[in-house]
Amino acid sequence: MKTFTAKPETVKRDWYVVDANGKTLGRLATELARRLRGKHKAEYTPHVDTGDYIIVLNADKVAVTGNKRTDKIYYHHTGHIGGIKQATFEEMIARRPERVIEIAVKGMLPKGPLGRAMFRKLKVYAGTEHNHAAQQPQVLDI
């Protein structure tokens, strides 16, 4: 019996909507990354993007455990000398709450062109509204 390999043009991708209200950031991000990769499917193939599209709502209400709300620090560099910037979890949630989930999930996906293609299927919104109603997303309880 030959090993099954999924073809990119035959992969069926579904749309799911997830409510992040009260969910722990890391536990939510691991499940999102697993579904974006397609590892929950029987036809999973490592070198083919077999994952689903995922819409995350209420990103501003995601939870973290312990003192991470004030102690967790996100760093980025502007590219200029001495241009390292930092922001705490609270500041990130206040400024751009979508980025918190995006950063967590992106770190759990493969690095390279395939990982970037998987990441593009993640749509994160701070509120309860999204503009993907035409795709008829199913509610996914994580």
Curated annotation (Swiss-Prot):
One of its GO terms (molecular function) is mRNA binding. HAMAP family: Ribosomal_uL13. Part of the 50S ribosomal subunit. This protein is one of the early assembly proteins of the 50S ribosomal subunit, although it is not seen to bind rRNA by itself. It is important during the early stages of 50S assembly. This is Large ribosomal subunit protein uL13. Belongs to the universal ribosomal protein uL13 family. InterPro entries: Ribosomal_uL13, Ribosomal_uL13_bac-type, Ribosomal_uL13_CS, Ribosomal_uL13_sf. Pfam families: Ribosomal_L13 (PF00572). One of its GO terms (cellular component) is cytosolic large ribosomal subunit. Keywords: Ribonucleoprotein, Ribosomal protein. It comes from the Bacteria. One of its GO terms (biological process) is translation.
